[in-house]
C-alpha cells in the first residue's frame, strides 16, 4: 500500500489578524500561505476547508519526511513577513497522520484531532501521532 500522509493546518489567531489589519490583509495572508504550500508541496493536493484551515494530501510521503518539510514551512512563515508594507509574521498549527487504511472521513477526523492538540498545547507547532 502506498504511503499517503495527511496534514490539516490552521492559521493561529486569524480573527485577530482580520480585526487588526483588515480583511484585505487577511485575504492576502491566505493567498501568501497558499503560494508557500504550493512551493513546499508541489506534489500535494491542497484544499482550503473554509476560513483559515487547509488540508494537504501528500502521496508517496512517509510522515517523518512530511514533518521535516512542514517544519521548513513553519520556520519560513515565522521568519518572513507577509510583505514589506505589512510586517506580519504568520503562525500556524499542524496536525499530521499517515492515512493508512483509514477512510477519508476517519483520516480527516484524526488529523483534526492532532491539529487541536497542537492548538491546545501552545499553537505554532506540528503534532503527529506517527512522529
Each predicted region: which residue ranges?
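A short pre-motif secondary-structure segment
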Residues: 45-48, 88
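Short hydrophobic/aromatic beta-strand micro-patches
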Residues: 57-59, 97
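Catalytic-core segments of nucleotide cyclases and related cyclic-nucleotide turnover enzymes
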Residues: 67, 71, 97-131
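Conserved long alpha-helical elements within nucleotide-processing catalytic cores of c-di-GMP signaling
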Residues: 1-5, 12-39, 47-51, 55-56, ...
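Short, conserved catalytic or interaction motifs in soluble domains
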Residues: 19, 59, 82, 119-120
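Hydrophobic/aromatic docking surface of two-component receiver
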Residues: 60-61, 102
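Short, hydrophobic secondary-structure boundary micro-motifs
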Residues: 6, 85-86, 126-129
Amino acid at each position: 500500500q502506498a504511503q499517503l500522509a495527511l496534514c490539516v493546518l490552521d492559521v493561529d489567531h486569524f480573527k485577530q489578524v482580520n480585526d487588526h489589519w483588515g480583511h484585505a490583509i487577511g485575504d492576502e495572508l491566505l493567498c501568501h500561505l497558499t503560494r508557500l504550500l504550493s512551493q513546499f508541496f508541489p506534489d500535494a493536493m491542497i484544499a482550503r476547508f473554509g476560513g483559515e484551515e487547509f488540508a494537504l494530501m501528500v502521496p508517496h510521503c512517509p510522515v517523518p519526511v512530511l514533518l521535516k518539510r512542514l517544519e521548513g514551512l513553519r520556520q519560513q512563515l515565522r521568519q518572513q513577513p507577509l510583505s514589506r508594507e505589512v510586517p506580519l509574521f504568520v503562525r500556524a498549527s499542524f496536525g499530521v497522520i499517515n492515512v493508512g487504511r483509514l477512510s477519508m472521513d476517519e483520516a480527516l477526523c484524526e488529523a483534526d484531532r492532532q491539529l487541536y492538540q497542537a492548538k491546545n498545547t501552545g499553537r505554532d507547532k506540528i503534532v503527529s501521532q506517527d512522529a
